Amino acid sequence: MDDEETAEIEDVNVLVPATGGEGPVDGASAMGAVQETENVNEESEAQREEDVVRDYMMELIRQSDEQLAADAPDAAASTGSDGSGDDDEQPNQNEEVGAGSGEQEDEAASHDSDMSLDSPGSEDDSVVWNPHPPGWMIPPNRLHSAVDMMVTQARNSDAGIAGLLSRHHFLQRIRSIVFSQERRRSRTSEEGEASSEPPHTPPPPRSPYDVEMEEGIRFDTNLAAEHSYFGNNSSRVPGVDYLEEGSTHHMLIFLHQHILFPGEVLPFMIDGSLIDEEMQQNGLDGLIFAVGFPLMQPPEDCPNRLYGVTCQIYEKGESGRQLVFYKSRALQRIVINCDDIQGLPQYIARNPTNKCYSKVKILPEYFLPEPLKCIDMGSMSRFRDIPSMRNMYQRYQITSTPWPLDACLEYSYTDIVEKARKKLEIHKIDTMPKCPIQLSFWLVRNLHLTEKLMRSTFLTDSVNTRLQIIGSTLKDESVFYCRYCNSSLAYCSDLFAMSKHGVQTQYCNSAGYIHETNTVYRVMTHAIGYSGEPTTEFSWFPGYQWHIILCKFCAQHVGWEFKAVQPNLTPKLFFGLAGSSVRIGKLVENTPVNGSTFVVRNLLRMVSSEME
């Protein structure tokens, strides 16, 4: 810290009167005070430094509160604006994870936050607010408590209290402490507080984004689905084998940081000798291997289980880095007994070097047809498919069953499929499968359930139950939140398909790291910042350049901005949100977008400007 900043902090200390002061002192008293100061011990000096930092931060909080009082009406009425004028600010980021980054990706892969499915701030945190003050206000006593906690922790650290005066460390500590306090408040809030809130008028509907209004050539979604960014020197590998449900098999296993559902494509780079040797030993063209999800919590009665999917390789290519690029497709759900694992399983995204085997059991998929379709009405069955006779035919069917019509329709998946089809029309997706089993997995990937519901749908063996869970979420309006600081980033209604596989796709970067990416037309105002320079190198979408985007509040990597570089290519601009950096939560109608951290934003902005 330079002399000007140090002088600033000492000046702020003057703003807070010392306890016990009686007024001005004469020269003799001042000389005595100076002499006394020179003789203080090390403990008193450390206490003085603590007081300087604490007083400085308290003064910033006071100024932030005054600014809040002036801006409160505007903040309560706004949605998505944080009152910031620093649109061009580019937050510093020590760990940047980009679509084409190399060493940064390897470092990012080692962090639990990139792989957590149960990180601080669950899927319901966004709907828990204190009903008494406005939802965007954080009480000053919590900010004061955060300051005290930060100073106490710094005092016990090796750097001591002086470590707080480093600009980057200072800002990071404020973020960390305030975020932890906010998450603790969300987890410990009583459930009754949320239920006692009076009903609120829902916000006006947002205007949908229609890419058809853009003039130009529509991007070919087959290019992204084929993962053409690895080149055109790949060859098809024959064979798609489904294993018998309930059977047990011995196979090669890897780990993965995301949940895969059957039907998803998993691209990856790996040492080719691991796969080629396995193919030669088994005499298989399209090798089947297992992928486990260690961060998906098993049921409480079976804690020693690892759930995953079988994957089969269907295409092979060369990456040019002594690694081989493979494309595989998830086929069936599996369960692994951890006691049967032979060797140390490794993550498939981290260039595994060792083989690991285990027995895996293929999980069943139970599907019950709709009750009314199981009733044979004899010669009257010919009227079933006549639209004008359908209602009358249904009434005749009901008379032959002991169940009322509502009970039969409750387990009808046709209505769920039709509602889902209408909701997905805005995403421009026309690849909905017809098989109920494949359809249930496809809807999970494209309707974007919360992580808790995703685990529930994966663990259930009943296709009907899976569709019922999906149907219960069709009316909810959801938002992408930053996994690190809980700031809202984008509306799920702005999702669209840049791949023929849907709105959520797995992509592999040049370093071998696999990203689960959600493509959206737009993000919220003032939600993101940028890091690095845009580039077209190794772009997942040919004809587009990518640029790393960071959460504007916590400066963590949350995805990429893609901008068309070829003329007349549409959409001209869109965003890819990294699944490891975002979570899905319900939209809170009575809370301004990004408003829960309004006070903290003002504080951090003021701290940053004061320390520039």
Swiss-Prot record:
Residues 477-586 form the CULT domain. Residues 1-30, 58-133, 181-211 are annotated as: Disordered. It comes from Drosophila willistoni. Substrate recognition component of a DCX (DDB1-CUL4-X-box) E3 protein ligase complex that mediates the ubiquitination and subsequent proteasomal degradation of target proteins. Has an essential role in mediating growth by negatively regulating insulin signaling. It also has a role in maintaining presynaptic function in the neuromuscular junction synapses of third-instar larvae. GO terms for biological process: protein ubiquitination. This is Protein cereblon. The gene is ohgt. Likely a component of a DCX (DDB1-CUL4-X-box) protein ligase complex. May interact with pic/DDB1. Zn(2+) binds at C482, C485, C551, C554.
